[in-house]
Amino acid sequence: MRISALEGCRVALWGWGRESRAAYRTFRAAFPKQPLTLFCTIAEATEVQALADPVLSIETEVSVPRLAAFDVVIKSPGISPYSPLAVAATAAGAHFIGGTQLWFAAHADTDGVVPGAVCVTGTKGKSTTTALLAHLLRAAGHCTALAGNIGMPLLELLTPQPTPEYWAIELSSYQTGDVARSGARPVLALVLNVFPEHLDWHGSEQRYINDKLSLVTVTRPRIALLNAADPRLASLALPQSDLRWFNRRDGWHVRGQVVYRGDRAVLDTALIPLPGAHNGSNVCAVLATLEALGLNAVALAPAACNFHPLPNRLQFLGERDGILWVNDSISTTPHATLAALDCFLGRCRVAVLVGGYDRGVDWECFAARITRKVPLDIVTMGANGPHIQALLAPLAAGRFGLHAAVDLPQAVALARTALGAQGGVLLLSPGAPSFGAYQDYVARGRHFAILAGFDPEVISSISGLGIA
């Protein structure tokens, strides 16, 4: 559905996050006098009323009959279509679309392809990978947009001037289905990895995997680029796309800490400001993307050394009193926490803070791995903290310290005490979402920075968003 098709329709917005705000501005720019209804919270309604929009109706209670009363409901990506309310509304005739769906439909050419669109998804690493891709495309002299789930809704760049040559677009599992439903196809779709996350939104592990992979299985990109080291991805067959791989010995891969193209050594990852073996894989993904687009990836690889890392992703805040503070607030799965720990274990003393919102993710894998290479201390916190504590308690004796905190300030205090005068690394890598305690992972990371004694404004901005 294109935006023009909304003219004369009964339209509602459901949610008032950043994506919905962008959808509101887009709708109002196209149809200044057309009535619009917004379903939002009471707190959000106060903010929205300040817009003084005479043809905007605000409702703070949402129901099946009200949703079904509209021709189209533009839904915030954070609202699950699998929730009982959304399912019942759909059965009653409600038609939901998303802002990402509107953008892709608006930009598709006559063949259904969105020129220059490179979509990046994966359970972890997608923000860093998308930003690094934009960085290297710009280093090659190409006007490139960096947008999507990374922090700039696509609808904020609906009709940019000049039109970018490339679009580096990060997509969450909430948004990949939007692309599939738009009928549009990206030039290239990159999938980094897939393991269980967002089970509360998707309802099951298999549905999460299906929704995530719809970017390549349903959307049919011209080029599908997959991680050969991921078992779920390695088994895919995509006959309607040009299927490419990274993390294979005959292509882009990492040996030790060096990035190779086949047998040719190209780049030492120690020169790139992205710690961890997982980031070496992300670099390979970006270079394989550039190559698939027909660019000289080998020549562009050194420009990765000038990349500015993103906040809240293994972000080195600085050192205070012998303690190196590392903010990995983006970590929302146990797999991500294990990857963060791998950057430090065996090299220095580490106290790690884990736990947060409980969405039913299994921590058994964390417990199994943590005994092989142990940190100095683990501090649990948040709603799933007691569950993690119970899993780790039988393993801790004589191996690592284990403490329980009620919140982040107490967790930080316990970790500082554990590190003591000898110091070490104090790592926030929760392996769980921030909901319930914070608005989002950014707010959690900012609070961590304050507790560490650093200015949250300095460490929170993402450079390069938009078009450059």
UniProtKB/Swiss-Prot annotation:
Entry's Gene Ontology cellular component terms: cytoplasm
Reaction it catalyzes: UDP-N-acetyl-alpha-D-muramoyl-L-alanine + L-glutamate + ATP = UDP-N-acetyl-alpha-D-muramoyl-L-alanyl-L-glutamate + ADP + phosphate + H(+)
Keyword Cytoplasm: yes
Subcellular location: Cytoplasm
Any single biological process term in GO: cell division
Disulfide bonds: none
Similarity-based family: Belongs to the MurCDEF family. MurD2 subfamily.
NCBIfam families on file: murD
Role according to the record: Cell wall formation. Catalyzes the addition of L-glutamate to the nucleotide precursor UDP-N-acetylmuramoyl-L-alanine.
UniProt name for this protein: UDP-N-acetylmuramoyl-L-alanine--L-glutamate ligase
Annotated organism of origin: Xylella fastidiosa (strain 9a5c)
